[in-house]
């Protein structure tokens, strides 16, 4: 069975792209009560299970259920979440919510917001032979046609993610003598990589991982906190779906860290992939190219959008490039006009160096794909990692090549990726600190950069998953 998840989420220590385990081995906690004695299990014709005690009493046993949270917290494997995601995170779930909204009483309806990633937009632009701006406007028209109220671009939330990553690196670099300010800093925007780090090398890797939220989860904060307030709604009255190039983003949205106990709602309620958007279009009998374009939505008036924008530094968000430029200026007073990448063992492993008078001041790298990640981890464990900062992505070639992107049966994968990269690169870029609305939101929404509120809404934490101590494993 082929899996749509990233290599890092499917891995064992042997290969980059292996099929996931067909069996969940989540250990069962056995309830051993004193004096309970021996009991029998009776199976009814309908398949239900009853515990028969020694005195003849019968108690119906609960069905074993594996939730997505169970999967994330399970140390038995680093995969096997597909069956849960089919129901909890799918375009059918989005369709169900949109359908229910149309028939619900006004006070029971939810405000539906859909946030689209630039990578997904580029993939759809190639499929429908559109430019990025027309793709964005026609996607807005389509989602509103099926019941969404607002459609946003996660390039806006990526501004916050990049700025927080810049500040975090400078702080860690200046305080690197402190064991808690560990270098190198490893990016955290890729959930496949984060899942692997937490489950496989927690104590080694987690101190190095950036706490800055990914663009998806920053958008979750923006929509459920800032935008909900602007609409005079509580977060649970807003349904937020995202369109992503990656199946692993479904796991990220389901993390307990991004769930509000107060309002009983997630920052991102549903994640659908680029391919699932294409399925929605097919099911609706709509061709994106034939739709009339609609005006683009913006989160605040000062950031009104006439066209989509993006960032320099490649199709995975540009973390390396933005942090490198900022650090060079902030730490050493050097203005970097052009970032020069030097390929190493392969095209998915590159490095960038800042030198002055022969001295290396900054040493950054980009490591994509599990094999490069594995080599990076081994260097870290041996204390031989020369880098200050590493942009880590589980998918070879990064997010534009994510497992949720559209495939072209009549085009080689390499050629398709080149076309997606070309259209992604056509979008006008801007520095995150210069993006309209960003500084206003830092003051108006977050009470200033570096505030407690900014830390709470723009950062997160990661958790090493302990190996289960129970020897009893159940095949489901």
UniProtKB/Swiss-Prot annotation:
GO terms for biological process: iron-sulfur cluster assembly. Keywords: 4Fe-4S, Acetylation, Iron, Iron-sulfur, Metal-binding. The keyword Cell inner membrane does not apply. InterPro entries: Cytosolic_Fe-S_CAF, Fe_hydrogenase, Fe_hydrogenase_lsu_C, Fe_hydrogenase_ssu. [4Fe-4S] cluster 2 binds at residues 190, 246, 395, 399. One of its GO terms (molecular function) is metal ion binding. It holds the Pfam family Fe_hyd_lg_C. Disulfide bonds: none annotated. It comes from the Eukaryota. The modification N-acetylalanine is found at residue 2. Component of the cytosolic iron-sulfur protein assembly (CIA) complex, a multiprotein complex that mediates the incorporation of iron-sulfur cluster into extramitochondrial Fe/S proteins. Seems to negatively regulate the level of HIF1A expression, although this effect could be indirect. Belongs to the NARF family. External component of the CIA complex. In the CIA complex, interacts directly with CIAO1 and MMS19. This is Cytosolic iron-sulfur assembly component 3. It comes from Bos taurus. The lineage of its organism: Eukaryota, Metazoa, Chordata, Craniata, Vertebrata.
């Amino acid at each position: 069975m082929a899996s749509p998840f990233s290599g890092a989420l499917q891995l064992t220590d042997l290969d980059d792209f292996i099929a996931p385990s067909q069996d969940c081995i989540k250990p069962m906690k056995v309830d051993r009560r004193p004096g309970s004695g021996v009991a029998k299990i009776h199976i009814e014709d309908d398949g239900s299970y009853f515990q028969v005690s020694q005195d003849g009493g019968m108690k119906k046993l609960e069905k074993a259920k594996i939730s997505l949270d169970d999967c994330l917290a399970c140390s038995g494997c680093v995969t096997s979440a597909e069956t849960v995601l089919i129901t909890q995170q799918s375009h059918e779930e989005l369709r169900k919510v949109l359908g229910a909204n149309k028939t619900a009483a006004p006070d029971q309806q939810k405000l539906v917001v859909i946030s689209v990633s630039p990578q997904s937009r580029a993939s759809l632009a190639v499929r429908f032979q559109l430019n990025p701006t027309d793709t964005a406007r026609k996607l807005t028209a389509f989602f509103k046609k099926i019941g969404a109220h607002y459609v946003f671009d996660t390039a806006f939330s990526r501004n916050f993610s990049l700025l927080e990553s810049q500040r975090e690196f400078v702080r860690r670099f200046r305080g690197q003598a402190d064991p808690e300010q560990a270098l190198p800093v490893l990016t955290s925007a890729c959930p496949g990589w984060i899942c692997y780090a937490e489950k496989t090398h927690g104590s080694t890797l987690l101190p190095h991982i950036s706490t800055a939220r990914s663009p998806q989860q920053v958008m979750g904060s923006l929509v459920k906190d800032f935008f909900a307030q602007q609409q005079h709604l509580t977060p649970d009255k807003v349904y937020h779906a995202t369109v992503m190039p990656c199946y692993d983003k479904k796991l990220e949205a389901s993390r307990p860290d991004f769930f509000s106990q107060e309002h009983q709602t997630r920052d991102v309620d549903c994640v659908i992939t680029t391919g699932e958007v294409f399925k929605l279009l097919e099911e609706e009998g709509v061709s994106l190219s034939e739709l009339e374009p609609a005006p683009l939505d913006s989160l605040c008036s000062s950031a009104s959008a006439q066209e989509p924008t993006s960032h320099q530094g490649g199709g995975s968000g540009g973390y390396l490039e933005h942090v490198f430029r900022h650090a060079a200026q902030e730490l050493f007073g050097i203005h970097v006009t052009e970032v020069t990448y030097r390929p190493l063992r392969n095209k998915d492993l590159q490095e960038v160096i800042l030198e002055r008078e022969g001295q290396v001041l900054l040493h950054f790298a980009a490591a994509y794909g599990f094999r490069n990640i594995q080599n990076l981890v081994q260097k870290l464990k041996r204390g031989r990692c020369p880098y200050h900062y590493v942009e880590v992505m589980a998918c070879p070639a990064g997010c534009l090549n994510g497992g949720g992107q559209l495939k072209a049966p009549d085009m080689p994968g390499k050629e398709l990726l080149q076309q997606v990269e070309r259209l992604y690169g056509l979008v006008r870029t801007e520095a995150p600190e210069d993006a309209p609305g960003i500084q206003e939101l830092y003051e108006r929404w977050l009470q200033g950069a570096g505030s407690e509120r900014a830390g709470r809404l723009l950062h997160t934490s990661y958790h090493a998953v302990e190996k289960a101590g129970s020897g009893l494993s159940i095949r489901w």
